[in-house]
Amino acid sequence: KIADQERMILGEIGRLTGVISQYEIDFRNSNKNIQIGKAKDLKLSNDKILNKFILANGFYSGIYNYLPGSGFIDFDNENLIILSSRGVLGYSNDFENQLNFKQIRNNIDKFINIKQFIKHRSFSLKDLLIHENKIYVSYSEEIKDDCWNTSIIMADMNYKSIDFKTLFSADECVHQFKNRDRVFHPHPAGGRIVGIDSDHVVLTTGPYRSRFLAQDEKSVNGKLIK
């Protein structure tokens, strides 16, 4: 009965999450530029000036909170790359004067899409890394129905279109409703990606609140994956 109540509550939350997520997906599919606006600069304690900008569109879905939208940044030479929690990907090399990011077409929705987003706002993309001319994205993968883990997709870096392929996907998963501790949350999922040399990256994986998995040497959860 508790599981049924949880499903009902999550369903109502999912409807709200779905509306926001679909709006962002529609923007991604439009391939429109991501507009930015100038915000008030911030003077730091060392007398340096921090220039602030606001993303005016494209980033709508939050991961921890519903709003504002969440995202990730990285650099590729002179280009600043941005990625939203729902797969809006763009770049700019002159954002002070250009005031927009050009979108990069991608197939992220092949791996995670509205079907997953409506189940909880924290089922999302988790990190972005540009490393050795490759682009890496981690995300919440629904391995089986309502059973999750954190995975990585990768591709050659390209500024027109990117065709991601799976780099890492675990065989095991943590069930959203049927798990040993009877507690689950998609936020403590890990997902951080770091390049450690020219041939390797490291991924963090979280326990999804099944904390005992971090102590289980046979489990990939709560670990660093190379």
Question: Where would I find each of the regions flagged by the language model?
Answer:
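Intrinsic disorder/low-complexity segments enriched in polar/small residues
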Residues: E6-R7, I25
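Acidic, Gly/Ser/Thr-rich repeat motifs that build Ca2+-stabilized beta-propeller blades
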Residues: G14, G18-F212
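A detector of repeated loop/turn-to-beta-strand junctions in beta-rich toroidal repeat architectures
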Residues: N149, A214, K218-N221
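Extracytoplasmic, non-cytosolic globular domains
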Residues: K223-I225
